[in-house]
Amino acid sequence: ACGLDRLIGDPRWCLHPVQVMGAVITQLRLWAEAIGGDRPWALRLGGGLITAVLVGGSAAAGWALEQLSLHSPWAVPLLVIALASALAGRSLRLAVEDVLTPLSSAPPDLEQARRKLGWIVGRDVEGLAAPELLRALAETASENAVDGLFAPLFWMLIGAGLWSLNPALPGPLALAWAFKASSTLDSMLGYRRGRLQWLGTAG
């Protein structure tokens, strides 16, 4: 899975599991806000249900594919592809290189570097000088390396350990997708503003 991620990364033409998770979160959020209104307790309950549905559903989908791969050899390549989809090492490396390339040109193309950096950070990058751009790039690269590479690998290892004890237990894909679901929830709902301060509590 790591080799596949390094080789092809996340092709833009291919539907990514995180895109599906994001679409589900968006729809469930609309329903939760329509039903809960501005009542904190109702929004917290709705957020808890969103978290349970998304994390539980992602883990269940991963577990189902794992079980299928145990009994159907043709499903093994699908399992490997699914595991690779939980990793973002190549995508992160390319995103970092997209910022470093204009910075290393002579003279540095700061405007291009700011534009590329703006795609991967959640802060205002206008007016940043080269040292500040590099600092912001280093910060976001380290954060995304945890969320996109090291944490999924950690949960894959835990899942592999569980699988070795009993193949019926959740394995590497189930735990990796559950983590990606919780990470996506945090990035979309984990804000202390408006209704999200209650809706995003569980996520």
Annotate the PLM regions:
Residues 1-203:
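Hydrophobic alpha-helical transmembrane segments
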